[in-house]
Amino acid sequence: MNIDDVLWKEAGCSTELDYIEQTSWLLFLKYLDDLEAEKVMEAELAGKSYERIIAKEYQWDQWAVPKNAQGEFDHNNALTGDDLIDFVNDKLFRYLRGLKDRATGPDTLEYKISEIFGEIKNKFSSGYSLRDALEHIDSLSFGLQEEKHE
C-alpha cells in the first residue's frame, strides 16, 4: 500500500489536487524535521548550538511518529483516530499559522511556513488514515543526497 491508496480511501480527499495538497504538507513537515535535525548535528559538531524553528511538541518525531528508546515507532505514545485529527486541526496547524508572529520579517522561514499553512486545510477526516500516511512518509529519509531525489 502507498500514500495514494491511503488517500483514495479518505473521504475528505476526492481529487488528485487533494492528494497532492495533503501529501505535500506531510512531506514538507517531514523534510523540515530532517533538515532541522541535520542542522542540530552540524552545530553540535562545530561546538555551537542551533535553535529549531519548530517547538518540540510540534516536531515530527513528537507528534507524527514518536519513537521509543530503541528508535522504533512507539505505538503506545502515538496519537491516532480522533485524537490525531484534533491535534493536527486544533494545535499543529494553529501553531504553524502563528509562526509569523515570532518571525523577524517576511523573508524568514517562520513567516513563509506560516503563510503556507494559512492556506492549507487538513482534509483527512480519519485519524487512522492519517496515521497510515504518516508512517509511509516517515519511512522516507531526506538526509542523504541520493534520497532527496526519490
Name each region found by the language model:
Residues 1-150:
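Non-catalytic, mostly N-terminal accessory regions of nucleic-acid modification and defense proteins
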